[in-house]
Amino acid sequence: MRAKVLLLVCAFLLTVFTCSINAQFRLFGPRQPRPTPQPMRKASALISRQAPLKVNQSLLKQATSDNTRIVVSIPKQRAYLMIGDNIVADGPISSGRRGHESPTGHKHVLEKDPNHHSSLYGDFVDGSGRVVRAGVSARSDSAPSGTHFAGAAMKWFLRLTEDGVGMHVGILPGYPASHGCIRQSVDGAKLFYDYVKVGTPVDVGDY
């Protein structure tokens, strides 16, 4: 009789213990492995990467400033140096950001200047050339005492409009970011500059 009672007590305790374990499992779930910490990404790694300048060397040998034209694709953020319908070179750009969109349509190169400087955007610098305030507009910002305006460098500049919009070397973050100009890589801007002339047609739009 005592053995039977002891057996019943053990069975009861086992049932209670099993129910308790199951309840805890349902409440907290199985132990999950901790996720592996991910290394912090540099800010530069978050910038959209653009394919570099591509050049068709065989077509480049045929290119002259008399037979080339330029096509700029705003959606693709690419500029094309072309002979007829054939692409001689294809390079990354950064066009005008929202509110400062690059003017679209059929244009021509109005001026070539290998060492152009902006008359509107640049920095305020002191007498020693030290930048006191960067990224200013000569139109809307006041120069601190003892400083003067130094226009931003726009190397290998190709003027497209009378009010100063053109193609030139600039920072390429992978999206439209300029004040209206069409920025190019150093190698792209130099190549385009070398193979066009004043009067070369330039088409800017949704190509």
Q: PLM features: residue spans?
A:
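N-terminal pre-domains immediately preceding structured catalytic cores
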Residues: 2-207
